[in-house]
């Protein structure tokens, strides 16, 4: 898939912008703080209805305005369509072909994106919540049912935690009902994640071995409080663990186990990647991003759109070649932000460049 045209209204430092893109490489050039990253953020926000930079939606709306609108014209394997996202103090409105979407799971995944930004290095050493978010974003785009299962799980989890916090005398029967629901939805979430991590490891290791000239292997593991593989046995083990931890949960007034506390770990040549070098970290994340692209194509039949936010200058000659070979050979529409073309050493002849200056966009 590729985005042919994008219209921005009141997004960050952009007032009104209408522009068309190349189905191949699109490069945004400009000094810092001019709006290059904002433009990639707009594409990301249109795809996922959330920003990768802030949790405060109000920050996305241009100063002194009270709403924003994004409209994208998308070409997919299945045909052309339009996406629209409106944001105001009343909330979000999402539309596909001008038809309002009632559920996020009906909208997310229509346009798939993979973002590669400098902060992705935090995936290795950062908090577990970052790695769970990484899984949720990928799976949410690939499998709409995952978003539904995750939403249901989070709803029951919130109910259970609220009950534990506010009720002085616990009704064991009612808590058992919540436990049953939590285990049902939670086991589905865990099963989705286990399957996905298995596929991700396969693809990421393939790319990592190529980047390291066969010297390194990459393994990704999913760490859960439940280790079984199929939905039913996961559910049974989940319920058993909830029962074992019930008194602890009542005392601490929260739910101590479940996919909301799970984590993933990375190993290079069987060594925890936390102890790897900075160069190895870059190779790992690059392998991960290329694996995301490969998996989305494999599991949906269509390419995602790749957003490279100020990362090319962080990659050496070998890594740049590997990344650009992948996106060019696989016909992946790619957006790159940079302050200069000088360190983009291996760009093909046919690229579309945009010069960004104080919220204005000029195509060459």
From Swiss-Prot:
UniProt KW keywords: ATP-binding, Cytoplasm, DNA damage, DNA repair, DNA replication, DNA-binding, Nucleotide-binding, SOS response
Pfam families in the record: SMC_N
Primary localization class, coarse: cytoplasm
One GO BP annotation of this record: DNA synthesis involved in DNA repair
GO terms for MF: ATP binding; single-stranded DNA binding
Keyword Thylakoid: no
Any one of the GO CC terms: cytoplasm
Compartments (UniProt record): Cytoplasm
Keyword Ligase: no
Binding residues annotated for ATP, in chain numbering: 30-37
InterPro entries listed in its UniProt record: DNA-binding_RecF, DNA-binding_RecF_CS, P-loop_NTPase, RecF/RecN/SMC_N, RecF_2
Family, per entry: Belongs to the RecF family.
Record function comment: The RecF protein is involved in DNA metabolism; it is required for DNA replication and normal SOS inducibility. RecF binds preferentially to single-stranded, linear DNA. It also seems to bind ATP.
Record protein name field: DNA replication and repair protein RecF
């Amino acid at each position: 898939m590729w985005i042919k045209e994008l219209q921005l209204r009141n997004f960050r430092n952009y007032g009104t912008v209408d522009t068309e893109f190349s189905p191949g490489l699109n490069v945004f050039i400009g000094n810092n703080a001019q709006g290059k990253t904002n433009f990639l953020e707009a594409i990301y926000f249109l795809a996922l209805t959330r920003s990768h930079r802030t949790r405060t939606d109000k920050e996305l709306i241009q100063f002194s305005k009270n709403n924003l609108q994004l409209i994208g014209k998308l070409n997919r394997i299945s045909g052309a369509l339009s996406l629209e996202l409106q944001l105001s103090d009343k909330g979000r409105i999402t539309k596909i072909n001008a038809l309002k979407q009632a559920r996020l799971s009906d909208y997310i995944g229509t346009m798939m994106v993979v973002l590669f930004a400098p902060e992705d290095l935090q995936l290795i050493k950062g908090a577990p919540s970052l790695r769970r978010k990484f899984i949720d974003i990928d799976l949410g785009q690939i499998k709409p049912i995952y978003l539904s299962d995750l939403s249901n799980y989070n709803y029951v989890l919130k109910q259970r935690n609220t009950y534990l916090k506010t009720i002085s005398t616990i009704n064991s029967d009612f808590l058992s009902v919540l436990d049953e629901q939590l285990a049902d939805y939670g086991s589905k979430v865990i099963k989705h994640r286990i399957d996905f991590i298995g596929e991700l490891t396969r693809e990421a290791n393939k790319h990592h071995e190529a980047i390291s000239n066969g010297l390194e292997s990459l393994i990704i593991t999913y760490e859960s409080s439940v280790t079984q593989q199929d939905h039913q046995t996961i559910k049974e083990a989940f319920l058993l663990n909830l029962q074992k931890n019930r008194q602890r949960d009542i005392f601490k007034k929260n739910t101590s186990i479940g996919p909301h506390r799970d984590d993933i770990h990375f190993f290079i040549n069987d060594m925890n990647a936390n102890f790897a070098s900075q160069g190895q970290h870059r190779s790992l994340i690059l392998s991960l991003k290329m694996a995301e692209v490969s998996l989305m194509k494999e599991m949906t039949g269509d390419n995602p759109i790749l957003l490279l936010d100020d990362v090319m200058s962080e990659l050496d000659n070998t890594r740049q070649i590997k990344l650009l070979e992948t996106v060019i050979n696989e016909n992946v529409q790619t957006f790159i932000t940079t302050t200069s073309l000088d360190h983009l050493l291996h760009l093909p002849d046919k690229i579309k460049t945009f010069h960004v200056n104080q919220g204005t966009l000029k195509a060459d």
